[in-house]
Amino acid sequence: MERWTLSAILAFLLLLSLLLPSLLIMFIPSTFRQHASLWKARSLAKTLLMASSARLTPLSSSRTPCVLRQDSKKL
């Protein structure tokens, strides 16, 4: 097993110190994008929920869909 020399250790630490900030720069923007997409998904879900409840309210008071379902079951 070979021992590391002081110059090799310093070279490795220098390389690590140069690579670490670039890795952080690569991964930090992806976390911000995830929060934005999560916010958009929640907003879309809320919009779809409001739209579906507005459309379904008149249908539940109407008797026509119930009659159509019963006729299709007899066939």
From Swiss-Prot:
Gene Ontology biological-process entries: killing of cells of another organism
GO molecular function terms noted in the UniProt entry: enzyme inhibitor activity
Keywords: Cytolysis, Host cell lysis by virus, Viral release from host cell
Pfam family name, one: Microvir_lysis
InterPro entries, A to Z: Micrvir_lysisE
Protein task: E protein is responsible for host cell lysis.
Note: Phi KhT, a host-range mutant of phi K, can grow on E.coli C and B, besides K12, and is more thermosensitive than the parental phage phi K.
Record-given protein name: Lysis protein
Organism: Enterobacteria phage phiK
